[in-house]
Amino acid sequence: MAGMRLILVGPPGAGKGTQAPNIQKKYGIAHLATGDMLRSQVARQTELGKEAKKIMDQGGLVSDDIVTGMIKDEILNNPECKNGFILDGFPRTVVQAEKLTALLDELKLDLNTVLELQVDDELLVRRITGRLVHPGSGRSYHLEFNPPKVPMKDDVTGEPLIQRSDDNADALRKRLVTYHEQTTPVVEFYKKKGKWAAVDAAQKPEQVWEQIVAILEKAE
């Protein structure tokens, strides 16, 4: 089982946040999300973290080399990575994919697969714009898929529910256009390498999970 290394790709609302912990638990591997890695390096004041903080403080985007450096640091020093890892949020461009390939070659590691969670854009819009949250507890509901017993009221306290402002349809559609523009070339890059697998993420989470396990069993 040693060595399950995969990349998880999917648009906002596709369920990466649900499935990544499942994969992490089943295979005993590390979940490397770029945002978390950045925050951790900045908090620990590592050389990479200091460099990244300087750029972010100026409102810039952290370079691909810094992110690749952080991934290398995790692979070499994070004990959870000894069985493998899930990369989440990277690579987002073909240049990043090439840098990651070079890094894995340097470390003599293979990538098992790239899992793409696929969902129709309009279903994503319905999923995300229907989300309701109870601010006090963080309990979440959905207008269509998991409605509260009383409209717009929390089941437990009866307090009002809110919709998050960044969950509005226009903003989300823009994010999805950007996502597809960025991701399509990356997916093509891995398809050519024979490292890509599609998952129908429009299904219920349990069914998505079954499909993921079936793909990973083959990819071992």
Curated annotation (Swiss-Prot):
Electron transport listed as a keyword: no
Span list, region LID: 130-167
Primary location recorded for the protein, binned into one broad class: cytoplasm
PROSITE patterns assigned to the protein according to its UniProt record, in alphabetical order: ADENYLATE_KINASE (PS00113)
Spans annotated as NMP: 33-62
Record EC number: 2.7.4.3
Binding positions (AMP): T34, R39, G60, L61, V62, G89, F90, P91, R92, Q96, R164, R175
Catalytic reactions on record: AMP + ATP = 2 ADP
SUPFAM superfamilies: P-loop containing nucleoside triphosphate hydrolases (SSF52540)
GO BP annotations, alphabetical order: ADP biosynthetic process; AMP metabolic process; ATP metabolic process
Any one GO molecular-function label of the UniProt entry: adenylate kinase activity
Localization in the cell: Cytoplasm, Cytosol; Mitochondrion intermembrane space; Nucleus
Cross-referenced CDD domains: ADK
Annotated keywords: ATP-binding, Cytoplasm, Kinase, Mitochondrion, Nucleotide-binding, Nucleus, Transferase
GO cellular component term, pick one: cytoplasm
Keyword field contains Nucleotide-binding: yes
Pfam families in alphabetical order: ADK, ADK_lid
Protein residues bound to ATP: G13, A14, G15, K16, G17, T18, R131, S140, Y141, Q203
Purpose: Catalyzes the reversible transfer of the terminal phosphate group between ATP and AMP. Plays an important role in cellular energy homeostasis and in adenine nucleotide metabolism. Adenylate kinase activity is critical for regulation of the phosphate utilization and the AMP de novo biosynthesis pathways.
Subunit description: Monomer.
Entry remark concerning the domains of this protein: Consists of three domains, a large central CORE domain and two small peripheral domains, NMPbind and LID, which undergo movements during catalysis. The LID domain closes over the site of phosphoryl transfer upon ATP binding. Assembling and dissambling the active center during each catalytic cycle provides an effective means to prevent ATP hydrolysis.
PANTHER family the UniProt entry points to: NUCLEOTIDE KINASE (PTHR23359)
Family named by the database record: Belongs to the adenylate kinase family. AK2 subfamily.
Name under which the protein is recorded: Adenylate kinase
Species assigned in the record: Schizosaccharomyces pombe (strain 972 / ATCC 24843)
Organism lineage: Eukaryota, Fungi, Dikarya, Ascomycota, Taphrinomycotina
